[in-house]
Amino acid sequence: MKVTNDIIYVGVNDHQTDLFEGQYAVPNGMAYNSYVIRDEKVAVVDTVDVKFAHEWLDNVGAALGGTKPDYLIIQHMEPDHSANIYNFMKIYPDTTIVGNAKTFTMIANFFRDMDLDEKKLEVKNGDTLTLGKHELQFLFAPMVHWPEVMLTYDSYEKVLFSADAFGKFGALDVEEDWDDEARRYYIGIVGKYGMQVQNCLLYTSDA
């Protein structure tokens, strides 16, 4: 599914999970979001839950159309965003993983067999990465709702990849009132970090 001419949605729908994180009922499933940004260099934003590795990798391969990804951007280390890092790197071993210092500390703990010393790009808050006409800016969002979270802003397309900050329950192939499930998600998942989410709105408005 195209978001823009250069940004392709490669996420998956989950209708297998009854309780998200073991406590939130999701009668209409969940969507795990991931994107491919195509330019002179190609970036993949986030992975998905490990149960959907094959479907996600097929989606990524179709979006790449025979090209190889240059970067895998990890915005959040919760498993529904990061579980397929290892599977991805087995297929695309020359890819550089983009994250912050806390991201790479977590990767080292979650994926002990991975050696990323020459395959990582550690970014700081406000750093940019140029793919060609697309310039990506990384905006740290600690405790929205984990300490390593960062958002990615594409200044060319004016698209914000917002990790969990503005998420919702529900798969994308189910028609439902967006605001009801977004409100329930916010209250359950990130509401306790409301001040941090408000800060996201403030500093992304200046990006």
Residues covered by each model-derived region:
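Conserved beta-strand hairpin/beta-sheet module of binuclear metal-dependent hydrolase folds
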Residues: 2-64, 151-154, 158-162
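Metallo-beta-lactamase
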Residues: 2-5, 99-149, 193-199
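Short, basic, glycine/proline-bearing loop/turn elements
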Residues: 70-71, 133-134, 181-189
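Short catalytic-loop micro-motif centered on adjacent basic/acidic residues
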Residues: 43-46, 71-74, 137-138
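Internal, well-ordered alpha/beta segment that forms a basic, Gly-enriched binding/recognition surface
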Residues: 138-169
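Active-site metal-binding motif and surrounding structural segment of the metallo-beta-lactamase
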Residues: 51-98
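Active-site gating loops and adjacent loop-to-helix segments of metal-dependent hydrolytic enzymes
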Residues: 166-188
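Conserved small/polar residues in nucleotide/adenosyl-binding loops
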Residues: 203-207
